[in-house]
Amino acid sequence: MNKPVDLPLPAPAAVVGASLPHESAHLHVTGAAPYTDDLPEFVGTLHAALGLSPLAHGVIESIDLDRVRGEPGVVDAWSARDIPGANECGAIVKDDPILAGESGDTLRYLGQPVFVVVATTRDAARRAAALAAQVVRARALPPVLTPQQAHAARQY
């Protein structure tokens, strides 16, 4: 009933498996390709950077954003409480926090975003965000290292 059939393939199928140069390969290898960092900035451009969790697992005790806001070039800084609406995102189930949260909330992994800082230059934003280890006070929790521990703690 079902027999293999050789169907004629349209011309684009002939390129499958063929070695073809990228359309901008010549520009890349000669150093002439334009990159985002090479483009001039618009007047008034602001730069954002994330302040990241200094702990892999812990409970936030406080976040001192006033210190971050006082850094040179910083326009403002925001934490989870400043997000209007839900602080969750996710491809299917919206259960991943955008920012870690506030006092009493759990830090889930090292480098989890805790706050966002906006500044007049990229360097100023990054310098202020790097203060996370000093401005995010958190109490460390025991690590959860095995699937059995995660199941017992209902951490899925």
Model-derived segments and spans:
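Flexible, low-hydrophobicity surface segments
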Residues: M1-Y156
